[in-house]
Curated annotation (Swiss-Prot):
Entry keyword Transcription regulation: yes
Localization in the cell: Nucleus; Nucleus, PML body
Modified residues (Phosphoserine): S185, S203, S568
CDD domains (UniProt xref): NR_DBD_TR2_like (cd06967), NR_LBD_TR2_like (cd06952)
DNA-binding region: 98-173
Species name: Rattus norvegicus
Stated role: Orphan nuclear receptor. Binds the IR7 element in the promoter of its own gene in an autoregulatory negative feedback mechanism. Primarily repressor of a broad range of genes including ESR1 and RARB. Together with NR2C2, forms the core of the DRED (direct repeat erythroid-definitive) complex that represses embryonic and fetal globin transcription. Binds to hormone response elements (HREs) consisting of two 5'-AGGTCA-3' half site direct repeat consensus sequences. Also activator of OCT4 gene expression.
GO cellular component, one term: PML body
InterPro entries: NHR-like_dom_sf, NR2C1/2-like_DBD, NR2C1/2-like_LBD, Nucl_hrmn_rcpt_lig-bd, Nuclear_hormone_rcpt_NR2, Nuclear_hrmn_rcpt, Znf_hrmn_rcpt, Znf_NHR/GATA
Phosphothreonine, modified sites: T208, T210
Region (Required for interaction with KAT2B): 1-166
Residue intervals passing through the bilayer: none
Protein name: Nuclear receptor subfamily 2 group C member 1
Length: 590
């Protein structure tokens, strides 16, 4: 029976490369022969071959003076980990090891996050995991990832990193531990640290903020002593030791264009200086989440013209994957009814037929993926941005809203985006895990209470706002409101004629009355035995006016887009074509 060496010499005599199978073990062997006799140093490029399994590759000189064996440590021969064992080679001396990146095949620099990779793939994986970036593939999710094409598809590159053993947990665990001073409780995080909540959001422990013990909760003043956050802080539940981590500093926010949240961030970076709000002396509540990351807050760029911002937004919008969900249909695409001109108002149209159709009941929100192991400010900001975009798209899908004209539409959304967003929070209460998000905010205020980084007045104001959100969402959940009812409540809020500066207020008021009549008819048909249901639902709307839009921005968006105001982003959102919305935003039915 021929040995491996004998088989190798047979192939060498033929002066060619060939794949053979050892009869004794059934192992695949690839023999590659160097044809150049004069060259001392040889470079061998291994080609992937079908049907191959982990085995040996013999690299030899034509005269068989030196035999090099390459052992595969990875089952995928397209990106092998190569160990070169040199025999009879005086130049190379003892055995040497040459590693190739398991992801792209470039020269590896060592083991990173559980896999042997190059510096490029190491940095790419680290940025993707730490920023919780979500990528999309424009192909069939099987793009070629090698040294020269690894930057063409970030989605396939990240999937390949994970498939070859790069661990997301390793990225989190390599961060430096937080040093806590002796004067402070060991269970309290500094106000400049990042706070994380457990990944298992359905667990009872998920609703308990990290670093808040029962004794610390008892020491809290004002609203906390009154038991307002009893649903956020379940009694008798103890938290396990949590992991504190710090984000990368001064890393550019070149996020994935496949998420609408990245559009908000990218557009915010191009915002004009006049759109930046003036910060007061108090630190924002998300300061403890942002951990001093200047990539979101420092927007001291050159002043951009409106044309520059519009062109940049158009380019970003074109990069989004078109959605295929019925909720992404163009406004009025499947609507019934007609429009006619109102006497004396040639520029405005009033729509005949129902104000809302069944298509407006659809309100599906998909959370960012992959889900981070620890809830952080970037994930909260991305989730809130998706909800904001989805709410704007819902308004755009109403033909009567479009009939008001662009200026009126923008004015209405600027005036009532906070109310629409809050209704969306209540509607997506479970999908977004709003209770856990609010718990994170409360945790930050606990930290500021310990560190004395915020004035008592400011802290009280923020606590009151969080409580209002909690109370409103809880009351809406208890009412078991269906999709039709949420749609009519949003329409009544959207078509509110009492905002100063609006034109065609009579038409807006007619649309609101129409929404109310249709709402009443729906409840009468659907809940004939619940006489006071309509009244109970309408009485929840005044609570929306108590929500401060500026504080909502600070809680949900400031950690993602810095000082850029939502008002400056809304006109660009409303100018987007519905077909340009990313299908990733729409998926799971509520």
């Amino acid at each position: 029976m021929a040995t491996i060496e004998e088989i190798a010499h047979q192939i060498i005599d033929q002066q060619m490369g060939e794949i053979v199978t050892e009869q004794q073990t059934g192992q695949k062997i690839q023999i590659v022969t160097a044809l150049d006799h004069s060259t001392q140093g040889k470079q061998f490029i291994l080609a992937n071959h079908e049907g191959s399994t982990p085995g040996k590759v013999f690299l030899t000189t034509p005269d068989a003076a030196g035999v090099n064996q390459l052992f595969f440590a990875s089952p995928d021969l397209s990106t092998p980990h190569l160990q070169l064992l040199t025999e009879n080679s005086p130049d190379q001396g003892p055995n040497k090891v040459f590693d190739l990146c398991v992801v792209c095949g470039d020269k590896a620099s060592g083991r990173h996050y559980g896999a042997i990779t190059c510096e490029g793939c190491k940095g790419f994986f680290k940025r993707s995991i730490r920023k919780n970036l979500v990528y999309s593939c424009r192909g069939s999710k099987d793009c070629i990832i090698n040294k020269h094409h690894r930057n063409r598809c970030q989605y396939c590159r990240l999937q390949r990193c994970i498939a070859f053993g790069m661990k997301q947990d390793s990225v989190q665990c390599e961060r430096k531990p937080i040093e806590v001073s002796r004067e402070k409780s060991s269970n309290c995080a500094a106000s400049t640290e990042k706070i994380y909540i457990r990944k298992d959001l359905r667990s009872p422990l998920a609703a308990t903020p990290t670093f808040v013990t029962d004794s610390e909760t008892a020491r809290s003043t004002g609203l906390l002593d009154s038991g307002m956050f009893v649903n956020i802080h379940p009694s008798g539940i103890k938290t396990e030791p949590a992991l504190l981590m710090t984000p990368d500093k001064a890393e550019s926010c070149q996020g994935d264009l496949g998420t609408l949240a990245s559009v908000v961030t990218s557009l915010a970076n191009l915002g004009k200086a006049k759109d930046l709000s003036h910060c007061g002396g108090d630190l924002p509540v998300v300061q403890s989440l942002r951990n001093g990351d200047t990539s979101f807050g420092a927007f001291h760029q050159d002043i951009q013209t409106n044309g520059d911002v519009s062109r940049a937004f158009d380019n970003l919008a074109k990069a989004l994957t078109p959605g295929e969900n019925p909720a992404c249909q163009s406004p009025g695409e499947s609507m019934e009814g007609s429009t006619h001109l109102i006497a004396g108002e040639p520029s405005c149209m009033e729509r005949e037929g129902p104000l809302l159709s069944d298509s407006h009941v659809v309100f599906r929100l998909t959370m960012p993926s992959p889900m981070p192991e620890y809830l952080n400010v970037h994930y909260i900001g991305e989730s809130a941005s998706r909800l904001l975009f989805l709410s704007m798209h819902w308004a755009l899908s109403i033909p009567s809203f479009q009939a008001l004209g662009q200026e009126n539409s923008i004015s209405l959304v600027k005036a009532y985006w906070n109310e629409l967003f809050t209704l969306g929070l209540a509607q997506c209460w479970q999908v977004m895990n709003v209770a856990t998000i609010l718990a994170t905010f409360v945790n930050c205020l606990h930290n500021s209470l310990q560190q004395d980084k915020m004035s008592p007045e400011r802290r009280k104001l923020l606590m009151e706002h969080i409580f209002k959100l909690q109370e409103f969402c809880n009351s809406m959940v208890k009412l078991c409101i269906d999709g039709h009812e949420y749609a009519y409540l949003k329409a009544i809020v959207l078509f509110s004629p009492d905002h100063p500066g609006l034109e065609n207020m009579e038409l807006i008021e007619k649309f609101q009355e129409k929404a109310y009549v249709e709402f009443q008819d729906y409840i009468t048909r659907t809940y004939p035995d619940d006489t006071y249901r309509l009244s109970r639902l309408l009485l929840r709307l005044p609570a929306l006016r108590l929500m401060n839009a500026t504080i909502t921005e600070e809680l949900f968006f400031k950690g993602l887009i810095g000082n850029v105001r939502i008002d400056s982003v809304i006109p660009h959102i409303l100018k987007m074509e519905p077909a340009d919305y990313n299908s990733q935003i729409i998926g799971h039915s509520l």
